[in-house]
Amino acid sequence: LNAWYCPKWFKGRHSIEGLEHITEAKAQGKGILLLGTHSTLLDAGGYICAQYFDPDVVYRPQNNPMLDMLIYRCRATIYQQQIDHDDMRGLVRRLKDGGAIWYSPDQDFGLKQGVMAPFFGVPAATVTAHRRLLKISKAVAIPLYFYRYGDIRNPKYKVLIEPMVENMPSEDEVEDAIRVNKIIEAQLRIAPTQWMWFHRRFKTRPEGYEKIY
């Protein structure tokens, strides 16, 4: 909530590493798909990023219209654009225009929208929509992660931007899903308690496997 109502909280408390990867992609006129996770610090990380470049965000409208309006209005102070995750044309258009869109391929939307790939060694339905977005828009994929560290009474915040993912998308959607899951695994190992584990990542189970939830 600090990112919405008290952004000055982050002054002198944050750092950003790897900004040159964003700068380089923008200098080449490329759109950027920022591969991130559903972190509890989503809007804090977005606010910090907005001090250095203009981020956009993919979102799913809330079921409660009042809550949806509140979140949308608050995030409008952080992100350049908020694009519905079902609006593929809007996402492609923004990427073609050179936007940098935060996108999180870390949820289970079933096998109609993905493939099975190991996630921390457990088979998990992994979305593949990012492959289509990248292929159509000619954008690049850049992993981005943000986390909190230090004393809980005086925390620090860091944004970590990694180099562009080479050859993404490839010709193999399963291999691409495995690569994306490995990127997310590496991010979560930095601060595992700050990921939204309640999102039922293993909801879809392969045939013959017992349900977890």
Predicted features by range, described:
Residues 26-28, 51-52, 85-213:
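Non-catalytic C-terminal accessory region of glycerolipid acyltransferases
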Residues 28-86, 97, 111-114, 152:
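Catalytic core of membrane glycerolipid acyltransferases/transacylases, capturing the structured
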Residues 17, 58, 160-162:
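Residues in well-ordered beta-strands of folded domains
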Residues 1-33, 68-74, 79:
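Membrane-anchoring hydrophobic helices of lipid-metabolizing enzymes
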